[in-house]
Amino acid sequence: MSTRRLTCAAPHGTLTASMTQAVESIDTQEALETLMGPEGPAAIIDFWADWCGPCKMMAPQYEAVATALAGQPIKFYKLDTERHPELARAFNIRSLPTLLLVHRGEIKDALIGAQAEATIRKKAEWLLNKATGRGLWTRLFG
Protein backbone atom coordinates (compact mmCIF):
# COMPACT_ATOMS: atom_id res chain seq x y z
CA MET A 1 0.00 0.00 0.00
CA SER A 2 1.51 3.33 -1.01
CA THR A 3 1.21 6.50 1.02
CA ARG A 4 0.88 9.90 -0.52
CA ARG A 5 1.83 13.04 1.37
CA LEU A 6 -0.30 16.12 0.92
CA THR A 7 1.46 19.42 0.42
CA CYS A 8 0.45 22.90 1.55
CA ALA A 9 0.52 25.73 -0.97
CA ALA A 10 -0.03 29.39 -0.07
CA PRO A 11 1.55 32.71 0.79
CA HIS A 12 2.72 33.47 4.33
CA GLY A 13 0.26 35.00 6.78
CA THR A 14 -1.35 34.89 10.19
CA LEU A 15 -2.41 31.44 11.34
CA THR A 16 -5.92 31.28 12.77
CA ALA A 17 -8.72 28.77 12.53
CA SER A 18 -12.32 28.74 13.69
CA MET A 19 -15.69 27.33 12.64
CA THR A 20 -18.99 29.16 12.25
CA GLN A 21 -22.53 27.90 11.87
CA ALA A 22 -22.39 28.85 8.19
CA VAL A 23 -19.78 26.12 7.57
CA GLU A 24 -20.63 22.46 8.16
CA SER A 25 -18.22 19.59 8.67
CA ILE A 26 -18.28 16.47 6.48
CA ASP A 27 -17.54 13.49 8.71
CA THR A 28 -19.00 10.47 6.94
CA GLN A 29 -19.03 8.76 3.57
CA GLU A 30 -22.83 8.95 3.59
CA ALA A 31 -22.80 12.74 4.02
CA LEU A 32 -20.35 13.06 1.15
CA GLU A 33 -22.43 10.75 -1.07
CA THR A 34 -25.55 12.83 -0.37
CA LEU A 35 -23.68 16.02 -1.21
CA MET A 36 -22.30 14.51 -4.42
CA GLY A 37 -25.59 12.91 -5.47
CA PRO A 38 -27.57 13.99 -8.54
CA GLU A 39 -29.79 16.19 -6.34
CA GLY A 40 -26.84 17.59 -4.39
CA PRO A 41 -26.83 21.30 -3.62
CA ALA A 42 -24.46 23.90 -4.94
CA ALA A 43 -21.61 23.62 -2.46
CA ILE A 44 -17.99 24.44 -1.79
CA ILE A 45 -15.90 21.86 0.06
CA ASP A 46 -12.75 23.03 1.82
CA PHE A 47 -10.25 20.17 2.13
CA TRP A 48 -7.93 21.10 5.00
CA ALA A 49 -5.73 19.74 7.80
CA ASP A 50 -4.86 21.08 11.23
CA TRP A 51 -1.11 21.02 10.47
CA CYS A 52 -1.57 23.10 7.30
CA GLY A 53 -0.70 26.75 7.94
CA PRO A 54 -2.26 28.05 4.71
CA CYS A 55 -5.47 26.20 5.59
CA LYS A 56 -5.62 28.02 8.92
CA MET A 57 -4.79 31.30 7.20
CA MET A 58 -7.65 30.90 4.71
CA ALA A 59 -10.25 29.71 7.24
CA PRO A 60 -11.49 33.20 8.27
CA GLN A 61 -11.89 34.26 4.63
CA TYR A 62 -13.82 31.08 3.78
CA GLU A 63 -16.07 31.50 6.80
CA ALA A 64 -16.67 35.19 6.02
CA VAL A 65 -17.96 34.28 2.55
CA ALA A 66 -20.10 31.48 3.99
CA THR A 67 -21.59 33.89 6.53
CA ALA A 68 -22.19 36.58 3.89
CA LEU A 69 -24.05 34.10 1.65
CA ALA A 70 -26.03 32.44 4.47
CA GLY A 71 -29.62 31.96 3.38
CA GLN A 72 -28.65 31.59 -0.28
CA PRO A 73 -29.01 28.20 -2.03
CA ILE A 74 -25.31 27.36 -1.60
CA LYS A 75 -23.68 25.31 1.16
CA PHE A 76 -20.18 25.53 2.62
CA TYR A 77 -18.38 22.49 4.02
CA LYS A 78 -15.01 21.60 5.52
CA LEU A 79 -13.45 18.15 5.28
CA ASP A 80 -10.53 17.39 7.62
CA THR A 81 -8.16 15.28 5.51
CA GLU A 82 -6.27 14.01 8.57
CA ARG A 83 -9.39 12.67 10.27
CA HIS A 84 -10.95 11.40 7.03
CA PRO A 85 -8.16 10.58 4.55
CA GLU A 86 -10.36 8.09 2.70
CA LEU A 87 -12.83 10.85 1.83
CA ALA A 88 -10.03 13.09 0.53
CA ARG A 89 -8.61 10.19 -1.50
CA ALA A 90 -11.96 9.80 -3.25
CA PHE A 91 -11.31 13.21 -4.84
CA ASN A 92 -7.59 12.68 -5.45
CA ILE A 93 -6.73 15.68 -3.26
CA ARG A 94 -2.96 16.25 -3.41
CA SER A 95 -2.49 19.80 -2.08
CA LEU A 96 -4.01 21.71 0.80
CA PRO A 97 -6.03 23.76 1.02
CA THR A 98 -8.19 22.73 -1.91
CA LEU A 99 -11.67 24.12 -2.53
CA LEU A 100 -13.97 22.07 -4.74
CA LEU A 101 -17.05 23.75 -6.20
CA VAL A 102 -19.75 21.14 -6.78
CA HIS A 103 -23.34 21.04 -7.97
CA ARG A 104 -25.62 18.06 -8.57
CA GLY A 105 -22.78 15.63 -8.08
CA GLU A 106 -20.39 17.27 -10.52
CA ILE A 107 -17.18 19.12 -9.75
CA LYS A 108 -17.57 22.46 -11.52
CA ASP A 109 -14.23 24.02 -10.50
CA ALA A 110 -11.36 23.78 -8.02
CA LEU A 111 -9.14 26.30 -6.27
CA ILE A 112 -5.80 25.03 -4.97
CA GLY A 113 -3.82 26.89 -2.33
CA ALA A 114 -4.92 29.65 0.04
CA GLN A 115 -7.35 32.07 -1.58
CA ALA A 116 -8.31 35.65 -0.80
CA GLU A 117 -11.83 36.35 0.43
CA ALA A 118 -12.64 38.20 -2.81
CA THR A 119 -11.63 35.18 -4.90
CA ILE A 120 -13.68 32.77 -2.79
CA ARG A 121 -16.69 35.10 -2.94
CA LYS A 122 -16.41 35.54 -6.71
CA LYS A 123 -16.28 31.77 -7.25
CA ALA A 124 -19.14 31.19 -4.78
CA GLU A 125 -21.30 33.73 -6.60
CA TRP A 126 -20.38 32.13 -9.93
CA LEU A 127 -21.49 28.73 -8.62
CA LEU A 128 -24.64 30.22 -7.11
CA ASN A 129 -25.54 31.84 -10.45
CA LYS A 130 -24.88 28.56 -12.26
CA ALA A 131 -27.01 26.59 -9.79
CA THR A 132 -29.95 29.01 -9.85
CA GLY A 133 -29.94 29.64 -13.59
CA ARG A 134 -28.81 33.23 -13.20
CA GLY A 135 -26.05 32.90 -15.74
CA LEU A 136 -25.17 35.43 -18.42
CA TRP A 137 -27.83 34.25 -20.88
CA THR A 138 -30.58 34.55 -18.26
CA ARG A 139 -29.38 37.95 -17.09
CA LEU A 140 -29.30 39.26 -20.67
CA PHE A 141 -32.48 37.73 -22.06
CA GLY A 142 -34.59 36.85 -19.03
Model-derived segments and their meaning:
Residues 7, 14-15:
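Short, positively charged and aromatic/hydrophobic N-terminal segments
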Residues 24-42, 85:
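A short beta-strand-turn-helix
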Residues 40, 48-51, 95:
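Short pre-active-site segment immediately N-terminal to redox-active cysteine/selenocysteine motifs
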Residues 52-55, 99:
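The canonical Cys-X-X-Cys-His
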Residues 54-70:
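Typically the conserved alpha-helix immediately C-terminal to a functionally engaged Cys/Sec
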Residues 74-76:
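Hydrophobic/aromatic anchor residues within beta-strands of the central parallel beta-sheet
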Residues 79-88:
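Structural microenvironment flanking redox-active thiols in thiol-disulfide oxidoreductases
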Residues 95-135:
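Non-catalytic, surface beta->alpha helical segment in thiol-disulfide oxidoreductase systems
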